[in-house]
C-alpha cells in the first residue's frame, strides 16, 4: 500500500505528483492493468515470448554497424 504524507502548506498538485511517481516506481499500475482481465496461461507465454524476440532483435540491431550508403 502506498502512503504519501502531505506536508504542511504543500499544494495538492505536488502531493499528487509525488503519489503518481511512487506508484509508477512500485509498478502498481502495470500490475493492475495486467490483472484487469484474465489472460490464459498460453496467451501469457505467447505474449512474453514475442516480447523477448522483439527485445532480442532490437539488441542485435543496436549492436550491428550500419551499412555504408554510397
Curated annotation (Swiss-Prot):
Belongs to the bacterial ribosomal protein bS21 family. One of its GO terms (biological process) is translation. This is Small ribosomal subunit protein bS21A. Signal peptide: none annotated. The keyword Zinc-finger does not apply. Pfam families: Ribosomal_S21 (PF01165). The gene is rpsU1. InterPro entries: Ribosomal_bS21 (IPR001911), Ribosomal_bS21_sf (IPR038380). Keywords: Ribonucleoprotein, Ribosomal protein. It comes from Burkholderia orbicola (strain AU 1054). HAMAP family: Ribosomal_bS21. Gene3D superfamilies: Ribosomal protein S8. One of its GO terms (cellular component) is ribonucleoprotein complex. One of its GO terms (molecular function) is structural constituent of ribosome.
Amino acid at each position: 500500500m502506498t502512503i504519501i504524507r502531505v506536508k504542511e502548506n504543500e499544494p495538492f498538485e505536488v502531493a499528487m505528483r509525488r503519489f503518481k511517481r511512487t506508484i509508477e516506481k512500485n509498478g502498481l499500475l502495470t500490475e493492475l492493468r495486467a490483472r484487469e482481465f484474465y489472460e490464459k496461461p498460453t496467451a501469457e507465454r505467447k505474449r512474453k515470448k514475442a516480447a523477448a524476440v522483439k527485445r532480442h532483435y532490437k539488441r542485435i540491431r543496436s549492436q550491428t554497424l550500419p551499412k555504408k550508403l554510397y
